Structures are given as C-alpha cells and as structure tokens.
Amino acid sequence: MLIGSLVELAWGEIDSEPIIAKIASEEIKIISLTITEGGYKVDFNQSRSVFWYVAEGLKRRMEKDLPITILSCDNMQMNGNVARCAFMSYFEAKYPEVAAWAKKKVTFPNSMVDRITPVTKPGKVTDVCCEDFIQWVIEDNFIAGRPAWEKVGVTFTHDVTPYEIMKLSLLNASHTLLSYPAYMEGFRKVDAVMADERYRA
C-alpha cells in the first residue's frame, strides 16, 4: 500500500529551519503528532525537542495571528489534554508570550486511535504490519478548520471518552483475557494464538 499523504520530509537534526517554516506557514492548519507516551515528558534542557520546534513555529504564527490545532495521535487516554499540559508548561517556562497567545489560538483535541501495529524489528524498518481493523475518533475541536476526514472513516465527536471506555473494556480486556491461558501454553504472539482454532472459537 502506498502512503500518499507523505509528500515532504525534513530532518531537523541537519536543518531546523524547514520544519519551523512549515509550522509557521499560513497553509498549515494542523500539526499532528505521534511521539509515543515518553515524548510528552518535557525536558527543559533539551535544545531541540518537539516542544522547541513547535514553539519556534508558533512565535512566527503569532506575528500574523494564525491559529492552529495540535493533534496528538498517540495511544494514550485523553491525549489532547496530555499534549496541552506538556506544550503549555514548556511555553510558559520558555516562551511566555507564546503561552499567552496559545491559550486562545491553539486547540488540542483528544483522539482515540485503534489499530494494532506490532513493534518494528531492527532490519525491517520498511515493513509496517498491522491488523485490518481501524478506528480513529477525534474530538471536533479544530480552531483553524479541518479536512473532511469523515469521508474516509474518521468519527468526529464532542467527547471521545465513551469510545475510550469501550476500547479499554472490550478490546483491551479481551486481549488480556486471551493472553493469560495462551501464555501458559507457551504462546508468545497474539497472531499465533488466533491461528489456533481452540482460541479462535
């Protein structure tokens, strides 16, 4: 499958300017993030973190008063709230003028992403395996507008909480229930368990 949404790549370790300029660009309305749970831990001494790149871009947006949405796509409950807390704490400590502006001009919608993708092994970074099922639920809180993603299956809602509770109660709980007896029998991967007719039944 070709992922056609990737049209440009910038490597900040080599040159930070293209990333900052893109964040500052008037055509950009949404910054989407997938930085894992650990990525939201703010290290105020780290010179080039995701928080720094975004803050530098927002400084320029602030000059033209261009609002923007920061959309966390990480697998955490209330990920938008987590993102808001992390970014705002960084802004308040390092960029107080950006913090004051962002309170009114930046939104952080919560989202729930559900599609299992196993950890990529060394030497196989080009292979991305995933299950067939996919669900993406997003709080409809986009200050600068958004694409019509509902046309391709995204669910927009005012509150993602019921969807998160459903996922935790039905999906995560059933995975856990399946894992215990399978592990006792020597299974170490869920796909191998599901290939066993006794468990699949």
Predicted regions and their residues:
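Substrate/ligand-engaging "lid" and interaction regions
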Residues: 1-201
